[in-house]
C-alpha cells in the first residue's frame, strides 16, 4: 500500500443517496507513531451522509487517544443541486502547516492549528498516511439505514489522483 507525507489528494465521485449510507475518502497513518486512534491522527478529505445529499464534511482528528481526542472541521453545502446527481471533485492540499479542502475546484475550508499529546506541532500530521475509500452502511456518523434506502448502493469513483512536488 502506498503512503504519503504532504501533497494534493483528489477524487472524482458520484455519491449515493439514502439514509444510513456513509461514503468517505480519508487517510490514516501508516504507523501509530503517537498512539492509538485518534492520537496518531485521521484526515477526512470527504465524508457524506446519504440523507443530507447537498452537504459533505472535511475533518481532522488528533490530540489524545479516543475518547479524549479532538476533531475539527466543518460541513460544506453545495450552492445548487446535490452530490448524488453527478460527479464532483473532492480534494485536499496538505502541507506541513496547513490543510485546504476543495470541492469542484473551490476552496471550502482551511485549517492551520492542531495539536498532539505525543509531540510538537505539526504532530501528528508529520508522518506518512495512506488513503481509504469506503462506503459504510449504518454507523455513528451515517446513522441507521432508512426503510426507503435502496440497495445495491453505489459509491461511483471516476478517479483518484495524488500529486506531490
Feature annotation, model-predicted:
Residues 1-165:
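GH16 jelly-roll
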Amino acid at each position: 500500500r502506498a503512503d504519503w507525507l504532504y501533497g494534493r489528494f483528489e477524487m472524482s465521485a458520484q455519491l449515493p443517496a439514502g439514509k444510513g449510507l456513509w461514503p468517505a475518502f480519508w487517510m490514516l497513518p501508516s504507523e501509530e507513531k503517537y498512539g492509538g486512534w485518534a492520537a496518531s491522527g485521521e484526515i477526512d478529505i470527504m465524508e457524506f451522509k446519504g440523507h443530507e445529499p447537498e452537504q459533505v464534511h472535511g475533518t481532522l482528528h488528533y490530540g489524545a487517544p479516543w475518547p479524549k481526542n479532538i476533531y475539527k472541521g466543518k460541513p460544506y453545502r453545495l450552492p445548487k443541486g446535490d452530490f448524488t446527481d453527478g460527479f464532483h471533485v473532492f480534494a485536499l492540499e496538505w502541507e506541513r502547516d496547513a490543510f485546504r479542502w476543495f470541492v469542484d475546484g473551490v476552496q471550502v475550508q482551511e485549517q492551520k492549528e492542531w495539536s498532539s499529546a505525543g509531540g510538537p506541532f505539526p504532530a501528528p500530521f508529520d508522518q506518512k498516511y495512506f488513503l481509504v475509500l469506503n462506503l459504510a452502511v449504518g454507523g455513528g456518523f451515517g446513522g441507521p439505514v432508512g426503510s426507503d434506502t435502496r440497495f445495491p448502493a453505489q459509491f461511483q469513483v471516476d478517479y483518484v489522483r495524488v500529486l506531490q512536488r
